[in-house]
């Protein structure tokens, strides 16, 4: 393993100007460059060395917020909004590709880049906003996991919320076993989720001709205000700010070398990994919408927007008790996956922005305590309806923070002074700027709608 800041003899490390501060110790230093890259094997074997981090990122694109918008879109408008799911995924692929480029080119994750590029009076507010986003993310995962436990085992929501604290032990165990073990668990759970939805879709028997047509955009999406509103929700719930910090940190678990040629190859293979993984996330999100369209919209149930109602309707509509059980299992797996990745994102944010390095269990306990307390209070006082409202609030908080992660990412990767010859091409920056503008505008609109109570 090559220590951070050094390079093997005979290889010249590429360093760039343009930063206010010198690069410090890497975040998650216990796993930094711990996974060997096969540099002498075939292209396939070298690419396989980078296989993994993209799937941890893909978890963030299958959170309960995405489930809710996909259920609403499918139940109300059938397959028509599949094109929007595809568009939002393409946006995500582009932004996550920039994350890998930033990390490999500069040796910094997004949090470190913000710290080293901006004065403290800007960097510290960005850190506080990022921490708020991590807490909101964890809150959503607590609620999603608790709902999954309730639907699958009948455990009361308030008890399920408290039980989510147990995953601290799971995270600690996995981190001690090595980063590849973490990736293996995540990919296994994603496989379970895919199997659950594949089975449910086979049961639902969707109209595949209509499914294919749904991936082609139509003018009705813009001309129909109700359809446009749901479409905005799908796009607005797609890119999660913590994923940008997470991806730029965990891609550096690979020991990819220090020369420009080695870094170019690392960017190429890491981008391939995330693109394949996000395509998998696209399949899952499309599956949720297809399931809702085939099960709910086709039978006249056009108002299914929350997880409880969807679960309750699957049994009578599909004529099988297996379908709702699979739905609950998939939700629970999503919750477990997300708690692991949210922990890592929280560690990267804290270490990257302010260089405070807590023991993983302390960091995890603090984040989970902040999430459990409001979730427990709301479930005790207001029940399942309260958790639904809290879930919506967590998505609004994430929307508020998103511009403060996306905009620096696009700016950094465009600057040759910081990135050198590995800076993003002008056309990539142009597309990324448009993507960032669209996401920011849509999120601002969703926030406006949340506080005014009605779409504009």
UniProtKB/Swiss-Prot annotation:
Keywords noted in UniProt? Cell inner membrane, Cell membrane, Ion transport, Membrane, Symport, Transmembrane, Transmembrane helix, Transport
Question: What topology does the record note for this protein and the membrane?
Answer: Multi-pass membrane protein
Where found, per UniProt?
Answer: Cell inner membrane
Domain of life, per lineage: Bacteria
- Cellular compartments per GO CC: plasma membrane
Q: Does the keyword Aminoacyl-tRNA synthetase apply?
A: no
GO molecular function, a single term: manganese ion transmembrane transporter activity
Q: What does this protein do?
A: H(+)-stimulated, divalent metal cation uptake system.
Family per similarity comment: Belongs to the NRAMP family.
Please give the name of this protein: Divalent metal cation transporter MntH
Which organism does this sequence originate in? Brucella melitensis biotype 1 (strain ATCC 23456 / CCUG 17765 / NCTC 10094 / 16M)
């Amino acid at each position: 393993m090559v220590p951070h800041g050094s390079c093997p003899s005979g290889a010249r490390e590429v360093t760039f100007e343009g930063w206010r501060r010198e690069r410090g110790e890497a975040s998650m230093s216990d796993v930094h460059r711990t996974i060997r890259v096969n540099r002498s094997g075939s292209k396939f074997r070298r690419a396989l060395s980078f296989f993994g981090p993209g799937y941890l990122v893909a978890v963030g694109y299958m959170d309960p917020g995405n489930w809710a918008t996909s259920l609403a879109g499918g139940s109300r408008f059938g397959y028509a909004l599949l094109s929007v799911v595809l568009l939002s995924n393409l946006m995500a692929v582009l932004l996550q590709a920039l994350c890998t480029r930033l990390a490999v080119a500069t040796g910094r994750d997004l949090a470190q880049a913000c710290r080293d590029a901006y004065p403290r009076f800007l960097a510290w507010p960005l850190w506080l906003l990022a921490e708020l986003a991590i807490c909101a993310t964890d809150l959503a995962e607590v609620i999603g996991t608790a709902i999954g436990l309730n639907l699958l085992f009948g455990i009361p929501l308030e008890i399920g919320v408290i039980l989510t604290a147990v995953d601290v032990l799971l995270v600690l165990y996995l981190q001690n076993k090595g980063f590849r073990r973490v990736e293996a668990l995540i990919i296994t759970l994603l496989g379970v989720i895919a199997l659950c939805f594949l089975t449910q879709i086979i049961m639902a028997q969707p109209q595949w001709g209509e499914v294919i047509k749904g991936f082609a955009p139509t003018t009705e999406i813009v001309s129909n205000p109700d359809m446009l509103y749901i479409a905005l929700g799908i796009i607005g719930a797609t890119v999660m700010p913590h994923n940008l910090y997470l991806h730029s940190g965990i891609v550096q678990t690979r020991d990819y070398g220090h020369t420009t040629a080695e870094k170019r190859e690392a960017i190429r293979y890491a981008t391939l990994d995330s693109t394949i993984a996000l395509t998998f996330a696209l399949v899952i999100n499309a599956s949720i919408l297809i399931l809702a369209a085939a099960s709910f919209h086709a039978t006249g149930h056009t108002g299914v927007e929350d997880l409880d109602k969807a679960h309750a309707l699957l049994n009578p509509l599909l004529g099988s008790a297996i379908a709702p059980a699979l739905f609950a299992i998939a939700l629970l797996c999503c919750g477990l996956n997300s708690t692991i990745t949210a922990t890592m994102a929280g560690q990267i944010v804290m270490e990257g922005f302010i260089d405070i390095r807590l023991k993983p269990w302390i960091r995890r306990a603090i984040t989970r305590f902040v999430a459990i307390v409001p979730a427990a209070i709301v479930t005790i006082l207001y029940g399942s309806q309260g958790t639904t409202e809290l879930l919506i609030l967590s998505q609004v908080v994430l929307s508020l923070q998103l511009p403060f992660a996306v905009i620096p990412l696009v700016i950094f990767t465009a600057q040759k002074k910081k990135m050198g010859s590995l800076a993003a091409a002008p056309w990539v920056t142009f597309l990324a700027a448009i993507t960032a503008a669209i996401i920011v505008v849509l999120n601002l609109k969703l926030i406006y709608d949340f506080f005014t109570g009605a779409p504009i």
